[in-house]
Amino acid sequence: MGLGRRAMVYLGLAEEDEDYLDDDYDDGRAVGRDDRRAMHEPVPMDRTVRRIDAREEPVAMPRRPPVEPLRPAGPVPMRRVAAVEESHPYRITTLQPRSYNEARQIGEEFRDGTPVIMNLTDMDDADAKRLVDFAAGLIFGLRGDLEKVTNKVFLLSPHNVEVTETDKRRIREGGFYNQS
């Protein structure tokens, strides 16, 4: 019997051919149709039914001590990592790249923990898009933040530095220059 035929029989789409049942395993004795059924008839099981009296006590399961958690449930307070407050001065680097080749400088400044203003106004649109994609990957990899300040001007903030609203407003107004 072929593979397709066996699959159809298995799925119940075709009847099993009785000619093929024992062809491969001929042991010399003739087996009739009734003998095959007798070989596969289910054996009746002896089942006894016992009624349970309502007066009988259920079997008690052994009690286990209550489970105690290893650590307390609920949120664990964590402090922010080196968050910069308004009283602490920080410097923001402004970079105005002219080609995609200057992406390395942006990455190094950002990696060192310095917020970077990326001014892409002097770049063509294709290179500017590549640089924004680079910055997005940089932000994702180092868990920073990317904000669009104006058209083609972006602020990249490291995860441990929070740029104040005052500084963001000054950047939008265009009066924020390199503070090195």
From Swiss-Prot:
Region annotated Disordered, chain positions: 21-40
Where, per UniProt, does this protein localize?
A: Cytoplasm
The UniProt keyword set, sorted, is:
Cell cycle, Cell division, Cytoplasm, Septation
Q: What is its main location?
A: cytoplasm
Which portions of the chain have biased composition (kind: Basic and acidic residues)? 27-40
Record keyword Cytoplasm present: yes
Gene Ontology CC: one annotated term: cytoplasm
> Domain of life, per the record?
Bacteria
Biological process (GO) annotations held by this record are: division septum assembly; FtsZ-dependent cytokinesis
Q: Which Pfam families match?
A: SepF (PF04472)
* Family the UniProt entry places it in: Belongs to the SepF family.
- Protein role: Cell division protein that is part of the divisome complex and is recruited early to the Z-ring. Probably stimulates Z-ring formation, perhaps through the cross-linking of FtsZ protofilaments. Its function overlaps with FtsA.
- How does this protein assemble? Homodimer. Interacts with FtsZ.
Protein name stated in the entry: Cell division protein SepF
